[in-house]
Amino acid sequence: MHRDMYSSRGTGYGQQQYGSQSGYSQNLGSGYPGSSVSGGAEGGSQISLSSRHPSITGAPQETDIGGGYRSHLSTAASHYGTQYGSVYGSTSLSSSQPLSTNGLGSSVLDNRSGYVPTLPDSPKFASGSYLSPSSHGYGQKTDDLYSDKLSGYIPVDRRQYGEQSSSYLGRELQNEPTRRYADPSNFARQTDLYDRIDQASLLRGEQLLKMQSLHTSSVDAGVNRQTDYLTERSSTVRHSDQEAMHYGGRLESDPHGLSVRNTSSYASQHTPSLLGAVPRRNLDDYIYPESSSNPGYGVSLPPGRDYGTGKGIHSAASLDLDYPGGMLARGTGAAPRVDDLRKGDRASYLREFDLREEERRREDQRARDKEREREREREHDRERERQRERERQRARDRERERILERREKERQGERERERKRALEIKRDRTPTARATSKDTKERTPVPKSISRDARSSSLRRDAHHREASIRRSSPIKPIRRDYVCKVLSSRLVDMERDYVTLDKRYPRLFVPSEFSKVVVNWPKQKLTLSMHTAVSFEHDYIEDGGADVKSTSTKPLALKTGGKSVWNAKMVLMSGLSRTALEDLASDKFFEDRIPHICNILKFAVLKKDHSFMAIGGSWDPTDGMDPSVDQSSLIQTMLRHSKDKLHLDLSNCRHWNPFLEIHYDRVGTDGVFSYKEITVLFVPDLSECLPSFDVWRTQWLAHRKALTERDRLLSQEVKKDTVEVTKDAEKKSPGDTSGTPTTGTKKTVKKIIKRVVKRPVNDGKATGMKGEKSDVPEHVAIPETTVPKEESTGTSSNKKIVKKVAETGDTSDPSAKANEQTPAKTIVKKKIIKRVAKRKVAEIDNKMDGDSKKDGDSDEKKVMEVGKKSSDSGSVEMKPTAESLEDVKDENASKTVDVKQETGSPDTKKKEGASSSSKKDTKTGEDKKAEKKNNSETMSEGKKIDRNNTDEKEVKEKVTEKEIKERGGKDESRIQVKDRKKCEEPPRAGFILQTKRNKDSKLRSLSASLDSLLDYTDKDLDESSFEISLFAESLYEMLQYQMGSRIFEFLKKLRVKIVRQRNQRKRHQEELSVKQNEAKSQDKRQKTAEHEDKEASVISESAPGKDDKETSGKETVDGSREIADKEAVAKTKETLGSKEVTVGEAVNMEVENQDEEDDDGDDDPEEDPEEDPEEDPEEDPEEDPEECEEMDVANTEQEEPAEEPQKKEENLEKTSGTVADPITEAETDNRKEERGPNDSKTEIKPKSETEKHGKQDGGTSDAAKREETVDKELLQAFRFFDRNQAGYVRVEDMRVTIHSLGKFLSHREVKELVQSALLESNTGRDDRILYNKLVRLSL
């Protein structure tokens, strides 16, 4: 039974062979004519299997086969009339292409409304891979297809298929029993289907023949995939309402009990793929499922062979994974359950989805890891960069610290040297320990007979020692200053500048938001500024009781005038450079404290309110004149009005006002819209025209000083009254004890008040003389109550002055006030005064060194020391003993007339001596010594007339002041003294007195500020007044830079012409030297030949026969031959010299002509010369020849030697020839010297330097050389304008920027050549520093 059922020659379900089936035999016969139906069935099945499954042979053939089938999908599907139609219909053939391309098409069932898939598709084989999109909609065209070709087939053969087809057509609808069987009338319309099947079979046969040659591999590899196809069909093609069976009617509870021998249903199976229907499956499909041994498509494979295991793309194991539940493994045993299929597909889909999700998560994780790695790398890079930056910052800090330490060491060394010098000077003055000792045995007396000589010798010894100490001190090593050069890189001659330009030019300048533009007037019109007129400004104030009248706002003024512009007129008063300042700018002195520069010499008078500078002036008023937009002369009236009102200054005599700047503002109203335009014009008047004469200025200045003195005196009296009241209150609070120590509170108040008192009387001392009040000094020294607190409170700066003032103000103050001025602070100061007296007294007695006064000096010394001890131990009680001790000292010293004569002298001379000895740089000359001797002699003669008490008091006073000078440092005090004396005695140069109004509300004051001070602004200066002053300072600095840069530019043009000319002359000179050397060599050869001929002739004459005849004839022949040789040599030398003269004369003429042409060209157009000359001589570029400057700086000795060699040779020729040179040769030598003159211009400086070195031997020559060496002071000032610290050089890059900023529109090559010429002339080409000290000494 099973053999019949599973026959190898029949179908897998007991069907007949292919030849017994009517539908397939017809199709097969038409596809394969001439072949036996029974014999060729198996072979045909094998061939068609490989051809119908192109996916078995692999991917390359799969794509070709799929491409061949694309156009014949519908026709090829009709070839299979039997059960193959459900498998190899349009779905199976179209599955080759989606498999090879991973097709994503949706299932046909998804596009139909009647069939909704209940099981999910396989993740690897989508539903669109098995169903062709061409099978859409199928039941509607069956009538049309069957009605055409019905008569072409036998009705008996069609009946069984039609009946079976009708049953299937009935099942296409919903599950209704009434529609199970279709109407038999439809069977008559199915004839057209078979015609189409015939045509498709023919085409299919042709395709199989074509594919047979391509497919030679076994069919076994595709069984696995075919099984996959069939399993997918069984799992997916099912309606949602149906049960486990597909299209086969309802099943019973036991599907295995059904009959399985109904072969008629299989024989008459239709092809629904042509109509687009879903392939129907029978019940046997589930009872006998497909497997590797039973494919299920009508043919059984040979026994013993399993073509599905381990072959194909997907093996059975992989299919088991794709379809879980062991469906393929149970394929031969029993039919799979639907629930298993459903669960297996869902599980596989979920597993595949999880795998894909996991893979996607891994990819995302890897991407995030990579991104984190990149971020870490970037962070590492940033960290390394930060580390490098920190290292660089540390290096910079270390370098800065090293620089600061080096500077600190230099300052410390300087202070140490200063201290050593001060100690040396002090050592010269202070007595020895032996002289100051108290023991009388140690002090050896000086004999009376030699006391006067000893004193004179000691004076001489002291003076000599002082001079030696000054001469012994080594000169101060100049401090090496840093190079500072401020050069603006922008174009200086731009007239109008907007907000962006200002922000770029001046980064530190705060520009107001309403600023629109600024117009600079100095580039377009020549301004007459008082640059060389020094003006002195005296600043004062006037008390104004009224309140400060605020100026009216500018906006109502603009509305009142009816215009849209508001004008402001302001000015800045400038003090120019004096003669001494100009000399300092061009001098070679070394300045320690303050380096002179134009920016710190120029002074400007401005106003200051709070912390901001203001220009002098205000807004324009219609009363000043016409509208400034029509006539700007009305602005001058505005300035005159404001200067009188604010400064009490009359400038009506000024003629040149010089409008310097115009600053424009666009004012915005409260509504945020443009309201009006405001224009501020800044003037710099020329004050040289309106300066008063010196006599008028002297009277004005003296009256002003007198008024100041009177005002200060009144203030001092008021303050004294306040101090008396304060001291009385303090005495009431603290009862008078024996110690007399004041409280801290009273001491502080007294100190504060006394400071003011001390500062005011300085003017009294300046205004009044000192000579008339010298006689009153003892009284005030004897009663030091008024002077004591002043000296104690002033500290360090004005102690010496106060001592003077006591003598001056003593007459004006009342004696009652003196008596009442006993303050508690007097005790502290008395100690110091007594100590000073004691010390100076000891020094005085020791310096006298008088042997007769030994005992008296000892007693005096003891008394003074006792006084000092008592004063240090006790308090105010010891005031009386101090006065008595002073009187005793005076009485005991009255008998010492010699000592008085020695010591008494004018206090002025002694002060001068102290000041000169304390200062470091002042040296005593012979005149000072003579003056000292005269003063000593005068004091010797006048000493008897002077009262002893007065002289002693003067000595005490002077010694106290000298001690104070020593404590404070004599250098600074002497300078201050000299300045104060000059201020007191002589008025400064002519100028103006600026008096501002002062009241409680106003803080406005006038002051003088340098250009550096005006340029020292910051971005925190937000006022418009500060902005205007700062902008004025920057514009003025640009004007100065333009002027100084123009000087340097003109000099560089001349220097360039000179260097090019010297280079051309040097080339010609070298060519001439080479020609002359060649001629000299040829001349030497001719001379040697002539001498050789002479020797031969003499030998021939000596070898003649006969002694007498030989001698006579020999002498004659020798003489004759010599005369002939001499004549020939002279002729030859004349010829050669003539030829030389001709050639050299022509060369000289050519040089003179070329030089004249060059001079003409240089005079006509000197700017073109630097460009043309390098083109004529491109070989010797200054950058390629850096050693030329060294030759020109030192001496051009290498050129002198070859120049002198031909001259020496010519002289030798003249000596040998015995002839005298013609005048032409002398002219030639003169011309040659003239030629060498401009070439060796630098060589003329060498003898000067040599004579300077040997100046001791030849003093006159060195002085003459110094006189001849001139310095261009204007050029030196220009260079030093850019070299702020006088380092001695200017860098090449700064010089290039300077020339570019002049606005001359020069090319970079021109500027480079100009600067390079200066570099090579002053320094080597390997350096970038132009040493301008050499350039200013050149004569161009």
Swiss-Prot record:
**Species this chain originates from:** Arabidopsis thaliana (Mouse-ear cress)
Pull one GO CC term from this UniProt entry: nucleus
Entry GO MF terms: calcium ion binding
Q: Where is the signal peptide?
A: none
Task: For this entry, list what GO says about its biological process.
Answer: regulation of DNA-templated transcription; response to salt stress; sodium ion homeostasis
Bias (Acidic residues) occurs at: 1153-1204
Q: Where is the composition biased (Basic residues)?
A: 828-840
Which organs or tissues contain this protein? Expressed ubiquitously at high levels, including in guard cells.
Q: Which residue windows does the record flag with biased composition (Polar residues)?
A: 46-60, 810-824
Basic and acidic residues bias locations? 173-182, 357-470, 723-735, 841-872, 887-988, 1069-1097, 1105-1138, 1205-1214, 1229-1257
Please give the coiled-coil regions recorded for this protein: 355-426, 1052-1086
Q: What induces it?
A: Slightly induced by salt (NaCl) stress.
Stretches with biased composition (Low complexity) = 7-39
The record's note on what follows loss of this gene reads: Defective embryo arrested at cotyledon stage. Hypersensitivity to salt (NaCl) stress leading to reduced roots and shoots growth and altered germination, and associated with altered sodium (Na) homeostasis and over-accumulation of reactive oxygen species (ROS). Hypersensitivity to hydrogen peroxide H(2)O(2) and methyl viologen (MV).
Free-text function comment from the UniProt entry: Required for salt tolerance and sodium (Na) homeostasis after salt stress. Together with BHLH148/RITF1, regulates the transcription of several genes involved in the detoxification of reactive oxygen species (ROS) generated by salt (NaCl) stress. Binds calcium.
Subunit and partners? Interacts with BHLH148/RITF1.
Q: Which gene encodes it?
A: RSA1
Ordered alphabetically, the record's keywords are: Calcium, Coiled coil, Nucleus, Stress response, Transit peptide
Q: By what name is this protein known?
A: Protein SHORT ROOT IN SALT MEDIUM 1
